[in-house]
């Protein structure tokens, strides 16, 4: 999907680590079609990644984020685009929450 590529590219531009997308369409869920996940070692970098994802989605896909959470504390930022939910973690929070393990049946693609 084009928008997933825009998001992963925006993450990689800001040196995000562990970038992956999870295709949830074949799972019996109504949450969204895709998760796009990454992590960074600092809150400053988490914020920079989130800002770049939002900017690139506006520029290249003409899409505004519908809802966002976590920008204040920068431990785990969630950007909700309805069909795509973006998760940007600080490294230790990604290890703790392990979203990939919770959604292990999803088809996962790694980008770095």
PLM segments and residue spans:
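Polybasic/polar functional segments that serve as interface/processing modules
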Residues: 1-31, 39-77, 91-94, 99-112
């Amino acid at each position: 999907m084009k928008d997933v590529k825009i998001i992963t590219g925006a993450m990689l531009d800001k040196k995000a680590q562990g970038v992956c997308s999870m295709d949830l369409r074949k799972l019996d869920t109504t949450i969204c079609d895709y998760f796009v996940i990454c992590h960074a070692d600092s809150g400053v970098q988490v914020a920079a990644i989130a800002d770049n994802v939002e900017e690139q989605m506006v520029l290249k896909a003409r899409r505004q984020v519908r809802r966002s959470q976590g920008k204040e504390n920068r431990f785990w930022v969630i950007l909700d685009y309805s069909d795509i939910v973006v998760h940007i973690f600080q490294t230790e929070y990604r290890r703790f929450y392990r979203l990939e393990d919770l959604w292990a049946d999803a088809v996962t693609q790694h980008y770095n």
